[in-house]
Design a protein with these regions (language model features):
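Solvent-exposed alpha-helical segments and adjacent loops
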Residues: 1-557
């Protein structure tokens, strides 16, 4: 829908595919202010494995004395716009050199859905192998999300992972020759050659565990249709809070270490887009009553033509923190140290204190550069016009932020930190302090729950759970100095604990409602508002799924 104020023909919409011009849609007099549907052919020669469609609006509303920032210059592209593609699937060779493609494609922004196939209800070691693989794929999927449907002796209609041993294998692998070592092989789906299966093969379940660790730690060496894992050796143990996705808390961190893509700390334009930096912090970082967090910020920017109100605004989690002026001349009274550098950019250095109490597990630091751009004026007979130029802003890679002066403390149980950060299990990124308790003969739903939980933790830490422990014997957890993750029923060794029994039964049967309820999650009610007002008891015929946190009876911490 084009603005009714546009000049016909002179105003147009340019369509690019991968920065190649595909066509121009001129705005005609009949289209002004009306919804328009137009078709534009796309040249398939310019389509690659990663594509970007860009729309560029060229708008004019006056022949002379035009204000390029006028609010009458607009064109709306509807959400119902779409690409209509006709394509033919091609058979892909069984080559692991591109692994994890096709099972996971980093260019696909959709949630990862990767089925896992077992010959039947898996034993504990086979579940541990699958959990490691799920956590590794979860670490790759990250913010996209992940789902691992479970199949017993069935074939899905999409790429999948298969676990098999010489003695126990799905029926569709009954003719596969036995293996002599932990083996990872890519094969065609017997029902569809365009679908691939990644078969994790072994002589027994211990081989499957070794192969799973090989995927998590040695996949960069994969090539050919199959590989064997000869051995894995730990050279250096992991340390607490060293998850790759978390900001380091043992020293100051440069902004270069926080970048997730090149050019992230740069922006250009008449009004440059905001520069954002993600800060994923351990949820138990103790910031209460702290004065703040030190950030040494270095930035460069195009000099404003005159001294005006151009500024840089700093926000944390969409909450405004502080503003700094963008100066056009030397001024020793300002907080910014300006040094002339290349192409008319100014160099600034400021120290900022971030209010610590606003920090959570996942934070976004945003820098908005607001320029006051002079606009043309005059009359039709005496018009003043000029061509606006782009402004360039850069946050220095050597800017630093320091979280090393704080302790680690948190009151548990707290299911929020489990949902948002996989904590406390993610304290050790490889889950070496975690013991998972699973049923002896799990159902598909219970295995899927295990894989979903481990995949979620992997997405938070950025590392596979290669050192987690797992058992199907509830008696083995007694006096264990570990974080326990229970899948399915509560082990009999814990059923004698009255606190746990009361907690589980309460979750099933009754709920308390507070005096005052707030719909906004950002509002944390005080003690008076959280005081229970009513208690309701319910008996239901349907099953219920729940996540429950409680203190281990075997450890006070």
């Amino acid at each position: 829908t084009p603005s009714p104020s546009l000049l016909p023909v002179q105003s147009q919409l340019k369509v690019y595919l991968n920065d190649e011009l595909m066509g121009v849609l001129p705005v005609t007099k009949e289209q002004l202010g009306k919804k328009i549907r137009a078709q534009l052919p796309i040249d398939p020669l310019y389509i690659t494995d990663f594509n970007r469609v860009r729309l560029e609006f060229v708008g004019h509303y006056r022949d002379v004395c035009e204000n390029p920032a006028s609010s009458t210059l607009w064109l709306d592209v509807g959400r119902e716009s779409y690409l209509d593609l006709t394509y033919q699937s091609l058979k892909v060779n069984n080559d692991l050199s591109h692994f994890p493609v096709p099972f996971y494609d980093p260019r696909d922004n959709r949630p990862l859905k990767l089925p896992m196939i077992f010959p039947g209800s898996p034993a504990v070691t086979q579940q541990q192998a699958a959990a490691i693989v799920a956590s590794w794929f979860g670490s790759k999927a990250g913010w996209r999300g992940q789902q691992f449907p479970v199949y017993f002796n069935e074939l899905p209609d999409r790429n999948a992972i298969v676990f098999a041993t010489n003695d126990k294998r799905p029926d569709f692998l009954r003719d596969h020759p036995p293996v002599n070592a932990p083996t990872i092989e890519m094969i065609d789906n017997p029902n569809d050659p365009y679908v691939k299966l990644l078969v994790i093969f072994g002589r027994d379940d211990k081989d499957l565990l070794l192969a799973a660790k090989g995927i998590a730690q040695g996949n960069i060496l994969f090539r050919g249709s199959s590989v064997t894992v000869d051995g894995i050796k730990t050279l250096q143990p992991r340390q607490p809070y060293d998850a790759p996705n978390w900001v380091r808390t043992d020293r100051s961190v440069t902004f270069a270490e926080l970048k997730t893509y090149e050019q992230q700390l740069q922006s250009s334009g008449l009004v440059p887009d905001a520069i954002t930096v993600a800060l994923n912090l351990p949820p138990d970082l103790y910031l209460l009553r702290a004065n703040g967090i030190d950030m040494d910020l270095k930035y460069r920017y195009t000099m404003p033509p005159v001294k005006d109100s151009s500024r840089m605004d700093i926000s944390l989690n969409d909450q405004f923190l502080q503003s700094f002026s963008l100066n056009s001349s030397q001024d020793v009274n300002k907080l910014i140290l300006r040094l002339p550098v290349l192409q008319g950019l100014l160099d600034g250095k400021s120290e900022v204190t971030i209010p610590a109490l606003r920090l959570g597990a996942v934070n976004q630091l945003r820098f908005d550069f607001q320029y006051m751009n002079p606009m043309p004026g005059g009359s039709i007979d005496n018009c003043i016009t000029f061509q606006p130029v782009q402004n360039h802003v850069v946050i220095g890679d050597d800017s630093t932020i320091d979280f090393s002066k704080y302790y680690h403390f948190i009151a548990l149980p707290d299911l929020r930190v489990f949902a948002n950060a996989g904590f406390p299990y993610s304290r050790m990124a490889d889950l070496s302090d975690t013991l998972v308790v699973v049923p002896k003969a799990p159902t598909q739903g219970q295995v899927a729950t295990l894989l979903q939980a481990l995949g979620g933790i992997g997405s938070q830490t950025g590392l596979a759970a290669i050192n987690l422990q797992m058992t199907d014997d509830g008696n083995q957890i007694k006096n264990k100095d570990a974080d326990l993750l229970l899948i399915g029923a509560i082990p009999s060794s814990l059923k004698d604990d009255t606190k746990i029994n009361l907690l589980v039964e309460a979750t099933k049967s009754w709920v308390k409602m507070p005096m005052r309820h707030y719909d906004l999650a950002s509002i944390y009610p005080d003690d008076e508002a959280r005081t229970p007002n009513t208690r309701t008891d319910i008996t239901s015929s349907g099953p219920m799924a729940a996540v429950i946190g409680f203190q281990s009876p075997y450890n006070d911490q």
